[in-house]
């Protein structure tokens, strides 16, 4: 199989970043940005910018009939996932491959419920330090999309096809043969970094240097390691150090999505991070006091909007 057409839903940081990369290299009609009519009007009127450059996107509404896409990329926030699943319906065909760049460890299963797990590859977006303000995105590091199969040790034809597509069009990627562990690792990083930077109302620099914020972040991450052992994923101290190394590559003035949400007075993905940790803690009878504190503090910030 060869991937020639891609549909992207969600023009947040990731959607703009990777959408722009592909739109500049493929025929315009081969990269479709799915958005409702109001959004399309706004995007066309105000523009969407990536590092100062106006993106030349081809927009389609969910209602428009079209040929199925070879690849669909979900780049929405978790609270927009159900709407997005409905919106891509006309783009899903028999041989469509779906990847989800969402945070957390649940979106693949939710998409798979709607369209079949046989269409879904696992994906982790990591290493980008993009900041989006309004319709303008800036970044120092593009990061990469890590893709692979649900089953450890397997590299399917779908994975090979997506890898070849990314290779051809300059999307930084990696194939991982243990995606469940990679997803839990990224989840661990998000639980630490996203929440701590949001609570301290700061930037990556706050958790890259030694101090109370970094201590809190690592303590929150260590609670995820304990839960991963109970869930059979078995993250280790080595994994913690790998993700701290990823963190050290990010531009110090950049901010994770949750800190950007708090700054813009939007409800955050706290349920996806400490909320999920608290659920797993309850299920496994494991105390997670640091994540409980982060959860309460972020909820308190949101209650003041």
List each language-model region with its residue ranges.
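Residues at the C-termini of beta-strands that transition into short coil/loop
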Residues: 35-37, 61-63, 102, 124, ...
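NAD(P)+-binding Rossmann beta1-loop-alpha1 motif at the extreme N-terminus of oxidoreductases
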Residues: 1-57
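Rossmann-like NAD(P)(H) cofactor-binding subdomain of soluble oxidoreductases
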Residues: 52-136
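NAD(P)-dependent Rossmann-like dehydrogenase/reductase catalytic/cofactor-binding core
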Residues: 2, 29, 157-160, 167, ...
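Short, well-ordered alpha-helices that flank and scaffold nucleotide-derived cofactor binding pockets
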Residues: 20, 24, 86-90, 113, ...
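Internal alpha-helical scaffold of NAD(P)-dependent oxidoreductase catalytic cores
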Residues: 91, 114-119, 134-237
């Amino acid at each position: 199989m060869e991937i020639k057409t891609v549909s992207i839903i969600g023009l947040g940081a990731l959607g703009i970043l990777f959408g722009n990369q592909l739109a500049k290299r493929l025929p315009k009609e081969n990269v479709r940005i799915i958005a409702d009519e109001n959004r399309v009007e706004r995007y066309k009127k105000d523009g969407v910018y990536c590092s100062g450059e106006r993106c030349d996107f081809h927009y389609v509404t969910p209602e428009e009939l079209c040929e199925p896409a070879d690849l669909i990329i979900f780049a929405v926030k978790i609270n927009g996932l159900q709407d997005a699943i409905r919106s891509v319906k006309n783009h899903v065909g028999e041989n469509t491959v779906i990847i989800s760049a969402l945070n957390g460890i649940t979106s693949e299963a939710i998409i798979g419920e709607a369209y079949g797990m046989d269409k879904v590859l696992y994906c982790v977006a990591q290493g980008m330090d993009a900041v989006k303000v309004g319709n303008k995105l800036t970044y120092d590091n593009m990061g990469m999309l890590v893709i692979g199969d649900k089953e450890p040790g397997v590299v399917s034809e779908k994975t090979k096809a997506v890898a070849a597509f990314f290779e051809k069009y300059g999307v930084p990627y990696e194939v991982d043969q243990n995606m469940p562990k990679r997803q839990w690792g990224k989840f661990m990083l998000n639980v630490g970094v996203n929440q701590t930077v949001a609570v301290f109302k700061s930037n990556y620099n706050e958790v890259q240097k030694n101090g109370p914020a970094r201590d809190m972040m690592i303590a929150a991450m260590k609670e995820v390691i304990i839960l991963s052992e109970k869930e059979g994923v078995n993250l280790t101290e080595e994994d913690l150090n790998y993700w701290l190394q990823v963190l050290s590559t990010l531009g110090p003035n950049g901010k994770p999505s949750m800190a950007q949400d708090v700054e813009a007075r939007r409800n955050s993905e706290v349920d996806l991070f400490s909320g999920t940790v608290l659920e797993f803690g309850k299920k496994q009878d494991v105390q997670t006091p640091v994540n409980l504190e982060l959860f309460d503090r972020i909820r308190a910030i949101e209650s003041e909007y």
